[in-house]
């Protein structure tokens, strides 16, 4: 039974984007509901968010997929709401934010996270640190990891190596002051612009981004081989936890102690 947040405490709400087509993944079912250690990928993602401090989730789904997602999330540890996505990820996020703004309880939220359902194994400490950074005053927060591969910029028959010392790979969940990210998405919709992620949406309108440490565990499931790797990661985390009855998100919590962006210095909110 999902635990409801104290009515006097503004909830931390996660918009979980699960409306993608998954054309590169293929397979008989969408990757969001593909099995990962016996559970749907989206269910594992919501459990991981809950383990890190999210109180409720708004899952954005493709039209016609509501029943599949409701079944997949029937045992969610936190309350889950469903909203139909748009033609693009950007539209889907905006639909999720509008749902929160119009909901009698969720509209009290001041902190919102936006997460890709296909990053199911995000460790709890990453979620905690994103939330803590926002609650300590950051407007837009994203987890990042170092780029470890050599990157070449290719132009026809010529190429050059890109200095990777300042490059970072961006992950989710990204965290925001709800009023600001909502305003930015609405303005972007009016202008007809497009961005690659929600941090870019905030930066477009002059807001500063804050970075916290991400995790290699939080891989994005794009192709079938990614699911195989995620399966190995999840089983390894479960073995390390030695608690077969605990949620995957809780087991991943033990992988690394909680650390927030150094300049903010904040522990877990729970």
Swiss-Prot record:
It comes from the Bacteria. It catalyses: 2-C-methyl-D-erythritol 4-phosphate + CTP + H(+) = 4-CDP-2-C-methyl-D-erythritol + diphosphate. One of its GO terms (biological process) is isopentenyl diphosphate biosynthetic process, methylerythritol 4-phosphate pathway. Disulfide bonds: none annotated. Pfam families: IspD. Its EC number is 2.7.7.60. Keywords: Isoprene biosynthesis, Nucleotidyltransferase, Transferase. The record marks 24, 31 as: Transition state stabilizer. PROSITE patterns: ISPD. GO terms for molecular function: 2-C-methyl-D-erythritol 4-phosphate cytidylyltransferase activity. Pathway: Isoprenoid biosynthesis; isopentenyl diphosphate biosynthesis via DXP pathway; isopentenyl diphosphate from 1-deoxy-D-xylulose 5-phosphate: step 2/6. The record marks 164, 220 as: Positions MEP for the nucleophilic attack. SUPFAM superfamilies: Nucleotide-diphospho-sugar transferases (SSF53448). Belongs to the IspD/TarI cytidylyltransferase family. IspD subfamily. Catalyzes the formation of 4-diphosphocytidyl-2-C-methyl-D-erythritol from CTP and 2-C-methyl-D-erythritol 4-phosphate (MEP). PANTHER family: 2-C-METHYL-D-ERYTHRITOL 4-PHOSPHATE CYTIDYLYLTRANSFERASE, CHLOROPLASTIC. This is 2-C-methyl-D-erythritol 4-phosphate cytidylyltransferase. It comes from Cutibacterium acnes (strain DSM 16379 / KPA171202). The lineage of its organism: Bacteria, Bacillati, Actinomycetota, Actinomycetes, Propionibacteriales.
């Amino acid at each position: 039974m999902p635990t409801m947040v104290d009515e006097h405490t503004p909830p931390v709400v996660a918009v979980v984007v699960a409306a993608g087509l998954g054309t590169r993944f293929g397979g008989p079912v969408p990757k969001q509901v593909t099995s990962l250690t016996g559970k749907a990928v989206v269910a594992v993602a919501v459990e991981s968010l809950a383990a890190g401090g999210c109180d409720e989730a708004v899952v954005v789904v493709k039209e016609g997929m509501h029943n599949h997602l409701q079944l997949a999330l029937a045992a969610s540890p936190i309350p889950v709401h469903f909203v139909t996505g748009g033609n693009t990820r950007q539209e889907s996020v905006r639909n999720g934010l509008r749902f929160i703004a119009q909901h009698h309880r969720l509209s009290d939220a001041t902190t919102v996270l936006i997460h890709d359902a296909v990053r199911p194994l995000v460790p709890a400490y990453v979620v905690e640190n994103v939330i803590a950074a926002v609650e300590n005053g950051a407007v837009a927060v994203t987890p990042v990891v170092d780029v470890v591969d050599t990157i070449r910029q290719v132009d026809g028959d010529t190429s050059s190596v890109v200095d990777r010392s300042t490059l970072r790979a961006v992950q989710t969940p990204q965290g925001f002051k709800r009023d600001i990210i909502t305003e930015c998405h609405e303005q972007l919709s009016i202008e007809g612009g497009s961005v690659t992620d929600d941090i870019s949406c905030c930066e477009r309108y002059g807001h500063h981004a804050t970075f916290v440490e991400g995790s290699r565990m939080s891989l994005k499931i794009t192709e079938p081989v990614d699911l195989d790797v995620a399966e190995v990661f999840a089983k390894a985390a479960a073995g390390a936890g030695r608690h077969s009855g605990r949620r995957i998100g809780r087991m991943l919590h033990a992988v690394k102690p909680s650390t927030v962006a150094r300049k903010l210095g904040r522990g877990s909110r729970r």
